[in-house]
Amino acid sequence: MNIRPLHDRVIVKRLEVESTSAGGIVLTGSAAEKSTRGEILAVGNGRILENGTVKPLDVKVGDVVIFNEGYGVKKEKIDGQEVLILSEADLMAVVG
């Protein structure tokens, strides 16, 4: 994958989760909730502060994160793979 996010943005590949109903039935497709966990595939250089310095991001390629999929999250298909482009502010936690 040849993509480089700008500034404080990251490229995330959503991790698939297997959802099971209360009765033990495995839910797939539209019946299953979409995961809000993903793996960081690429990171930007960082956020530009008011004084002009660049604050590096707190995440790195390979980190598994929990994210908020709200306004401003862009879905793209790159090399046949769906990825999300989001700001570091949309990341809620690093797992592990």
Swiss-Prot record:
Subunit structure comment from the entry: Heptamer of 7 subunits arranged in a ring. Interacts with the chaperonin GroEL.
Gene Ontology CC: cytoplasm
A Gene Ontology BP annotation from the UniProt entry: chaperone cofactor-dependent protein refolding
Entry similarity comment: Belongs to the GroES chaperonin family.
Protein name per its UniProtKB record: Co-chaperonin GroES
Major localisation: cytoplasm
Organism: Shewanella baltica (strain OS155 / ATCC BAA-1091)
Highest taxon in the source lineage: Bacteria
Coiled-coil residue windows: none
Alphabetized InterPro entries for the sequence: Chaperonin_GroES, Chaperonin_GroES_sf, Chaprnonin_Cpn10_CS, GroES-like_sf
UniProt-listed PROSITE patterns: CHAPERONINS_CPN10
HAMAP family for this protein: CH10
Location(s), subcellular: Cytoplasm
A Pfam family recorded for this sequence: Cpn10
Function: Together with the chaperonin GroEL, plays an essential role in assisting protein folding. The GroEL-GroES system forms a nano-cage that allows encapsulation of the non-native substrate proteins and provides a physical environment optimized to promote and accelerate protein folding. GroES binds to the apical surface of the GroEL ring, thereby capping the opening of the GroEL channel.
The entry's keywords: Chaperone, Cytoplasm
GO MF annotation: an example: unfolded protein binding
